[in-house]
Amino acid sequence: MEQLKNESSRQYEYMEEMKKWVQKKSEELGRKLTCHVTTFGCQMNEKDSEKLLGILETIGYEEVETEDADFLIFNTCTVRENANTKLYGHLGQVKKMKERNPQMMIGLCGCMMQEEHVIEKIRTSYKFVDIIFGTHNIFKLAELLKARVDSKGMIVDIWKNTDQIVEDLPSCLLYTSPSPRDCS
């Protein structure tokens, strides 16, 4: 239990570091950095997307309803039919946007990323993707984003399994709240 509290504290430290980075970038651009999370999948994906958006908003990103955002995350599913096809189709479109805006960052997560053949395809065919992570470590989004900012290369962090559940991190209730938006 103590280890999980320490991990939660560690992730908040990464959020604070990234908050400074986002603020600096926003000042350089003269506008807030924007983000968009696209969810392909089941209710678990929706819940995970709420957590991802909560972390992004905590570090200073502003959610927009378009995929032409500064940071775009695709949260994927292997259970829902056609999720793979949808993702690869969207990545084809996003590649053009990234060519126009090389500063744009693209993250892929979810259970589809747990499959080794998918990771290999992305590494070889979609080299413009910045961050790839699975279902077990979405709580590390700020840490992975920092690693990407520091390295300038693709970050891949897939955990095969874990008993680690990190709670007490921000979430933005989009799907499970009766009100249109509840971020905390």
Regions found by a protein language model. Give the residues of each.
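P-loop NTPase nucleotide-binding/switch module
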Residues: 156-173
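The C-terminal output helix
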Residues: 147-157
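Short, charged low-complexity intrinsically disordered segments located at boundaries
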Residues: 121-124, 153, 170-174
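Hydrophobic aliphatic residue packing
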Residues: 79, 129, 156-158, 176-177
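Cofactor-cradling patches in redox/metallo enzymes
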Residues: 1-146
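Single conserved hydrophobic/aromatic residue that forms the stacking wall/gate
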Residues: 175-184
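Residue-level signal for pocket-adjacent positions within structured domains
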Residues: 74, 107, 153, 164-167
